[in-house]
């Protein structure tokens, strides 16, 4: 018999294995490889928003006050886009515009590009986080795939649209009232509400809200009664082995209400995923079209008839006049450097005037 003395040589982990072990360790807040992208980018994006809305003026870019320091509140403060003259410059702090001067960089709108780019990568990092965790616990990746909808909307609105226009100036500023103004701009300059992709987006988002309400109410209505009494808050103590609610009862109820009903839970939940995500993707595609100045529906025959016949008017022709008014007012206000002057006689007037 042979006895070997000594230690078994330990395999040395390389740097990748060491990092992988630390990053994917089970802890209260999972980090993961995706966290290397998510956490720094989210930190910088949120920090940029808080810094900009607290201290930074938009006087040099838009001629408005936009910070708490200047008297704005939560709804009116914003991190505003750079001036139109800066076009698509990345506005790096060390670039030729700011030349390392932080105050100058803020005045030029550098915080907006900082927040927009870090925000986009933070959202992508969050989607990768869902992929990574799903793989770790052996789930399918539908959460991550669904989150591509909000990412598509953010990237199309904040990055692709202004890239198709003359500069970052025409993107939305990061603020509540600023976003509302951007929506009015979209309506006036692109007739966005009559765009079929916007219609599909509205149908998707509102349809998803309806499906969510119906589904939640139906599950609550058909909870199985058990020995402890059926109540909503047993959800926080999920010890039962059997089904939580009766799909058969729910199917019978909605069959009587509508004549048709979901009979398969997988199809039902896929449909609840499909409706909002498809709506968001359609909206994003529509905004990419607007970046290229593609037009919405035009009912030219109604416009011609309204111009010829003072007694003929439709809600469409009234909206077209409204859009002209928005353009006339917003162009002069938002682009003072263009010196746009509209004489009274060219401003839109309804047939009644």
Curated annotation (Swiss-Prot):
A single GO BP: photosynthetic electron transport in photosystem II
GO function term, MF aspect, one: chlorophyll binding
EC code: 1.10.3.9
InterPro entries attached to this UniProt entry: D1/D2, Photo_II_D1/D2_sf, Photo_RC_L/M, Photo_RC_L/M_CS, PSII_PsbD/D2
Record has Transmembrane helix as a keyword: yes
Positions of post-translational N-acetylthreonine modification: 2
Record CDD domains: Photosystem-II_D2 (cd09288)
Reactions catalysed: 2 a plastoquinone + 4 hnu + 2 H2O = 2 a plastoquinol + O2
Function: Photosystem II (PSII) is a light-driven water:plastoquinone oxidoreductase that uses light energy to abstract electrons from H(2)O, generating O(2) and a proton gradient subsequently used for ATP formation. It consists of a core antenna complex that captures photons, and an electron transfer chain that converts photonic excitation into a charge separation. The D1/D2 (PsbA/PsbD) reaction center heterodimer binds P680, the primary electron donor of PSII as well as several subsequent electron acceptors. D2 is needed for assembly of a stable PSII complex.
Protein name stated in the entry: Photosystem II D2 protein
Species name: Triticum aestivum
Gene field: psbD
